[in-house]
């Protein structure tokens, strides 16, 4: 019997790649220069990130795996029958498969949707799933952004009344500023949890580590430099599809990593190797000084007070916590605060 591949549903509302150049121009013409996160998640960028996240020193992934191996059955027990399980940024499947296997073992009839920006990565990840081993868990994929996924959840008529479990693994919420993280969680709660609030939840991983040596080892581990530099070649291809010109010469740039103690976050930037750099068209008026950073990513760490503030600001409460000894990472099940 031939098992058909899970469907990949295109839920993109607008031309994503056409909006990235506008974000690049906006970020590089500000006083404090930045690059948009979407620039780093091309197909090649995702492949480099997966390599980086598998490095021995990249503790967040290893700690998530450790917790899931021990606690997946308890997590699965907390997910309602007939739920939609939406993985917001699926990337590598090696973590979530532990939860899906636990759901299958408990005979939970659920539909798992992997959401990702890269069609080819979705197709590749699903090829690696032994779908013939699953009888209760059904698989599908959503090709689009976070916003596309939330819009789909609100508007697809055939799923409107089913319980939802939103997965935010991989410390995804740490990539947002603290205020934006609360807004993002609040938006998910209002979009995805309100139709069945007592049976729906968000499962999110957060990191409480604020030890600079451990953090800097993790975020400079193997694979991170090509991940960072792949964004520049992707930008060149978006602005100049024919390949006849460049905004960035990749060999002019370094990856820079630092811990910001005051803000409780790791900061990732690109810096010039040794000199001032004039960018190419259409940004030829932009000069990046040799001591200037172009920030592209932050990873916020959360102590207990910061977690409590995050959940409260988002209108959520933690219903369960799963962690393991010696782990700074933990998973939190969040539900709408009803009082």
Curated annotation (Swiss-Prot):
Q: Which family does it belong to?
A: Belongs to the methyltransferase superfamily.
The protein's Enzyme Commission number: 2.1.1.261
**UniProt pathway:** Alkaloid biosynthesis; ergot alkaloid biosynthesis
Induction pattern: The expression of the ergot alkaloid synthesis cluster which leads to the synthesis of fumigaclavines is positively regulated by the brlA and stuA transcription factors.
- Protein's UniProt name: 4-dimethylallyltryptophan N-methyltransferase easF
Which organism does this sequence originate in? Aspergillus fumigatus (strain ATCC MYA-4609 / CBS 101355 / FGSC A1100 / Af293) (Neosartorya fumigata)
The Gene Ontology terms for molecular function here are: methyltransferase activity; protein homodimerization activity
Q: Which UniProt keywords apply?
A: Alkaloid metabolism, Methyltransferase, S-adenosyl-L-methionine, Transferase
């Amino acid at each position: 019997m031939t098992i058909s591949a899970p469907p990949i549903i295109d839920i993109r509302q607008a031309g994503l790649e056409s909006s990235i150049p506008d974000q690049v121009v906006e970020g590089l013409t500000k006083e404090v220069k930045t690059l948009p996160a979407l620039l780093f998640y091309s197909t090649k960028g995702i492949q480099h990130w997966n390599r980086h996240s598998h490095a021995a020193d990249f503790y967040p992934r290893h700690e998530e795996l450790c917790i899931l191996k021990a606690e997946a059955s308890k997590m699965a027990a907390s997910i309602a029958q007939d739920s939609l399980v939406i993985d917001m940024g699926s990337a590598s499947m090696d973590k979530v498969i532990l939860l899906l296997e636990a759901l299958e073992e408990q005979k939970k009839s659920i539909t798992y949707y992997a959401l990702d920006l890269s069609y080819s990565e979705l197709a590749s990840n699903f090829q690696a799933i032994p779908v013939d081993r699953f009888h209760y868990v059904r698989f599908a994929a959503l090709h689009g952004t976070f916003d596309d996924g939330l819009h789909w959840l609100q508007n697809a008529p055939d799923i409107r009344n089913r319980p939802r479990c939103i997965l935010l693994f991989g410390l995804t919420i740490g990539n947002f500023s603290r205020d934006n993280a609360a807004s993002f969680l609040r938006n998910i709660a209002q979009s995805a949890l309100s139709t069945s609030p007592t049976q729906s939840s968000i499962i999110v991983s957060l990191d409480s580590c604020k030890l600079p040596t451990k953090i800097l080892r993790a975020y400079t581990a193997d694979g991170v430099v090509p991940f960072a530099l792949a964004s520049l070649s992707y930008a060149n291809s978006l602005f100049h599809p024919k390949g006849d010109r460049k905004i960035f010469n990749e060999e002019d740039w370094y990856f820079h990593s630092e811990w910001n103690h005051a803000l409780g976050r790791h900061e990732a930037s690109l810096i010039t190797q040794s000199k001032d750099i004039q960018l190419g068209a259409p940004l030829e008026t932009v000069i990046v000084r040799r001591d200037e950073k172009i920030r592209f990513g932050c990873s916020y760490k959360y102590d207990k007070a910061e977690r409590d503030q995050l959940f409260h600001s988002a209108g959520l409460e933690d219903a369960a916590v799963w962690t393991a000894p010696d782990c700074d990472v933990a998973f939190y099940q969040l539900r709408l605060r009803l009082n």
